[in-house]
Amino acid sequence: MYSRIGRIRCPKWGHRDSSQRFGTMFLTLVCAAVLGSTPVLGQPSSRPYPSARHGGNYMHNYYFPPAPSSTPWAPSWSPDGRWIAVAMNGSIWKVDPDTGLAHEISYNKKYHSAPDWSPDGQWIAYTADDGGTTIQLEVVNVNTQRVHTLTSDEFIYTDPVFSPDGSQLAYVSTKPNGHFNVYVRPILNGQWAGDEIAITKDNSFGRDRLYFGEWDMHLMPAWMPNGRELLLVSNRDVPLGSGNVIRLPVIPLGIEEAETVLDEQTLYRTRPDVSIDGKRLVYSSTSGTADQFSNLYVQPTSGGEPYKMTFFNHDAFHPRWSPDGEWVAYVSNANGLPQLALLETYGGAQRRLEISDRRWKRPMGILSLNTHDGATGEATAVRVHLTASDGKFYAPTNAYARVTGEGDRIFHSRGTARVELPVGTVNLTVVKGFEFWPAKLTAEITAGEVTILTVGVDPLTDMAAKGWYSGSTHVHMNYAGNLHNTLDNLMMMSDAEDQDIVNEQIANKDNRILDHHVFVPGGGAHPISTPERILVVGQEYRPPFYGHVFMFGLEDHLISPFTTGYEGTAIESLYPSNTDMFLKAKAQGATVGYVHAFFGNSDPLEGALGGAKGFMVDAALGTTDAVEWSGAGRAGFFPVYAAWNNGLRVTAVGGEDSISNLHASKLVGSVRTYIHTGERGLEMDAWFDGLRAGHAFVSTGPLVEFTVDGAIPGETVNLPEEGGTVELRAWVRSITPIERLILVWNGKVIEEVLVEENRHEAELSRTLSVSGSGWYHLRVEGRTSERFPLDADFAQAFTNPVWITVGDHPVRSQESAAYSLRWIDKLQGMAEAWPGWRSVRERLHVFEQFEQARKVYRGFTEGSQ
């Protein structure tokens, strides 16, 4: 191998002085033109996989293959046992289990996964993902490496598996109406040889199921050796989970003759595989969600008791019997990233199958990327967006390949990254949070050579120097995804995204409690915190009816149960209320707030009250400290303005709800809260004190300072009885263009300022007359078309209120009080219709809390009169 060394200093986005950087600036402009004119895989439609009418992001992560995975995924044995086919780097590979040597078998413009080897060893069927819109079926001839397209339409296809004699292919499709059904179709020499047979059909459960929808799913077919029956996973007649394992004949609508062989709550991970004698199935399970991690189990195919084969404190996914039944190949995330592993069926020996070398079928080179802080010269962690010459994304083998909430494909780097890439021009964008200019650049990859790039990210500003420290209020470490995440990795990603405080939340997924083992009593920062970055481990309490909430600073124990209102469980009742649980958390010293409260731009009162139905109750009772934005949107302003208009000082905060062990999820810190701690600096208590005091602004990218007579958000300006004038000042900076500044007084827009020149910065100064008590806040917005590289629909930031008190008059609004009363009336109507109450006493207790909140708002109405 040869090395070519290049040192590139990238321009700041929006930099005005190009006289000394003409060559580099020209390179960047060329890069932008190329990105604008070349189709790039991985930019899905506005909704990922639109032909799938249910399932959502959880299903996309737990069931759909990663597109791509930087490490092996979805093993399938060759019939002679000499090779294991896997998905890796967007292609199908065959791996020698003795040496770890991997040979690329399939390649085209799509991301390939879910391989299944034909019984004669000549063909591998697999899925082909176009980057988030459809998933199709293809088949490759192992000897000639010629690819045949099997499907090409708007639907989703998954789980291809050859029949024991190779004459048929079973698979899952969203045909005809967007719901997941199993089909079988004859196949011969890599081509269809007849019409498909629908083994299942669309079927309604009769009502919406929590996280799993109204319509049944039929997934993961596995052939019985006789070729006349299938096992599959279906949630037909199942209220919770992705379904049971059922056994059914391979005939049209065989689902009508199905028998259940495994009855347990599952989460898309089962992946049953039948032994060569047809007597047993091996599968991945959390034992009805009793375990935190997925382990391997065996059970009779006729039904019976499961037997646990592994006892890991990590996950074991996608098990597949070897042809002789002596080994099980599976995917292990013991060391973080998914890796190929083997388990001896009789004896229990375990082997991690390292990929010793990748033999690509096309010319490849290596990119070595080194990143540093442009101001200090020190190495720094970053986020990397990469599009290779073939329009696809590639990630280093030691990095987790991710798809952001907006559909960008990225990886995080600690400061050095090494990735194999196809020959040609690679386009990169290197990002470090909101306070550094992104660096855009291109490089040429040459076959057999190493291209070394050193990139500096230059600071836009330093908010900490002004007393502002940022952190998302909603981060999850592990949540049943493919990665076995760690606190260290969470801190690394937060470094790459440049957030100062990392607020990790322990949470339930159905009956499982993820990350409970990292809770440390005492209510303080976690011991791995550093002077540069604080880690706080809190809890997300997740009742689907009232709305999910955060609890940070619990001094003694986690709040249990972790949810209410789960159908068919012993916690189906809506008692206790969020009010009750807030009070219990506050008794432990916690700061609490509603999370991912409201999405979109419409008033939640016109719909089903959004994701924080209990907000207006707890705002009135003083039991919630905060309400969270989890994406760019305006819907939350309707209820929050109603609260602020009656002096209820609930703090608006930002937390994206990143689930960072999922491969497709919002990025850590993509929606965050900036808190002003002043001279106290970066310290946990100071940050949460500032949060509760409202010294905060929310941002998906723009940076804001806003004062009224020198008072910052959360503070009060006192004026005499006759009122007076106040001086408003605003300062805005942004790594992406901003379009407008919106000034709001008591919930009404009083001025909108368009930013027309240097759209990366704005300043505003106004002198305004005030005659009554109220509040000001500032909103900043950009255009959706200019959001990149932010992981948000558009650039948005807004401050909490600066309060104005005229004389001794409180802030009051009869209109907002009436709005709040209508909200609670609607909430109570929904609660009255809930079927899971256990007793009249429980209902009366909760409804009395609703009535106490009504009394508060009625009092505001009287006060405003």
List the model feature ranges, each with a label.
Residues 68-69, 87-93, 106-112, 125-157, ...:
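A flexible loop/linker signature enriched in serine peptidases of the S9 family
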Residues 373-392, 398-401, 408-419, 425, ...:
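C-terminal functional module detector
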Residues 349-366, 375:
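Beta-strand-rich domain onsets/edges
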Residues 43-64, 82:
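Blade/loop signatures of beta-propeller domains
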Residues 59-93:
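Beta-strand-rich domains and repeat architectures in extracellular enzymes and scaffolds
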Residues 468-652, 656, 661-663, 684-686:
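Catalytic cores of extracellular degradative/oxidative enzymes
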Residues 80-82, 120-122, 165-167, 226-228, ...:
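Short coil/turn segments that connect the beta-strands within blades of beta-propeller domains
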